Amino acid sequence: MTPSAISPVAAGWIRRWLILMALMVYAIILVGGATRLTDSGLSITEWRPVSGALPPMSEAAWLVEFEKYRATTQYQLTNAGMALSEFQFIYWWEWGHRQIGRLIGLVAVAGFAFFAWRRWLGQGLGWKLVGLIALGGLQGAIGWWMVSSGIGETERVSVAPYRLMTHFTLALLILAVIAWLWLDLGRQQRAGAPRAAQRAAMALMGLIFVQMAAGALVAGLDAGRTYTDWPLMAGEVFPAHYIHAELGVRSFFEGREATQFNHRLLAYGLWAGSLAAAWAFRKTDVHREFAFLAVLVSAQAVWGILTLVNAAPMGLALVHQGLGVVTTLWAVYTVWRAGGPKTVAEINPPA
């Protein structure tokens, strides 16, 4: 086997492994969303990647963890008087989120080691997978960086919204890389669509990533539970407190009015852009991809409005987040499909 060639059998198993990791990343994104919505993210005050895999196993151990949480600003300002059973509820959400992260790391490293041992990895793919695993390690570190913003000497009762945005956006990037590698190892051919279609697909994908990041800011500030009228905001087209004097430019990241207004504005632009692209490229080889992307964006926009006017209850908010991830993945597929024919044959044709 040449360094750049991968057998069909190897490609099939690697794709199954990538699908498993994609499902696990999707699951951790949803569990992370639930952790945020239940304000559980600060319940574990230490970063113990290995020893933290075991939860408290006795009442005494639970009381030790509870005492650590009682030292946080979140407990003192918002959860004072919380019962142990209530603490256990939020603890399990955060522990579960971290545990899925550990499992993803194990599956990633074990799978890579097995494929390398079998010599199933071409040189190019091997380095790409090393990069993917490195991104996963970075994501774990960023997760703690995010949590640490609400622990210790701080006035925060939740994690810093821009750190939450970074953590969430990197999870999307990891999922996008997994999807791209999975597509590259498949037998479906790229369409080689007109340059205009390729540029439009790239623009829509980029805008979707920006919109998802903006949504993370809204979530981090609970901004979706403050201005719950639509299409206006507190009866105004443009919110009066878009810029807070005490925040200045930080209003774009820390102001509820600015983050929600920007999220709405991006949604309108993305909605119009996806419909325009579906119409403009209706006679190309990627018309189905653009059409379905427009359907997903439309569904996400409508569901977002429904979530907003109901003050973002957990069920609606999680569906909104999950559908957003699916929309992002379809945008990645649209970019991949619209691109030129494969230039590096990584799959050997059957004998």
Curated annotation (Swiss-Prot):
Binding-site positions, heme: H263, H320
EC number(s) per entry: 1.17.99.9
EC class of the enzyme, as a word: oxidoreductase
Keywords: Cell membrane, Heme biosynthesis, Iron, Membrane, Metal-binding, Oxidoreductase, Transmembrane, Transmembrane helix
Membrane spanning stretches: 17-37, 103-123, 129-149, 164-184, 201-221, 261-281, 289-309, 316-336
Cofactors demanded by this protein: heme b
Any one cellular-component term (Gene Ontology): plasma membrane
InterPro entries xref list: COX15/CtaA_fam, HemeA_Synthase_type2
GO BP, sorted A to Z: heme A biosynthetic process
Pfam families in the record: COX15-CtaA
Membrane topology note: Multi-pass membrane protein
Reactions this protein catalyses: Fe(II)-heme o + 2 A + H2O = Fe(II)-heme a + 2 AH2
Family affiliation: Belongs to the COX15/CtaA family. Type 2 subfamily.
Function as written in the Swiss-Prot or TrEMBL entry: Catalyzes the conversion of heme O to heme A by two successive hydroxylations of the methyl group at C8. The first hydroxylation forms heme I, the second hydroxylation results in an unstable dihydroxymethyl group, which spontaneously dehydrates, resulting in the formyl group of heme A.
Record note on quaternary structure: Interacts with CtaB.
Protein name from the UniProt record: Heme A synthase
Organism: Hyphomonas neptunium (strain ATCC 15444)
Lineage of the organism: Bacteria, Pseudomonadati, Pseudomonadota, Alphaproteobacteria, Hyphomonadales
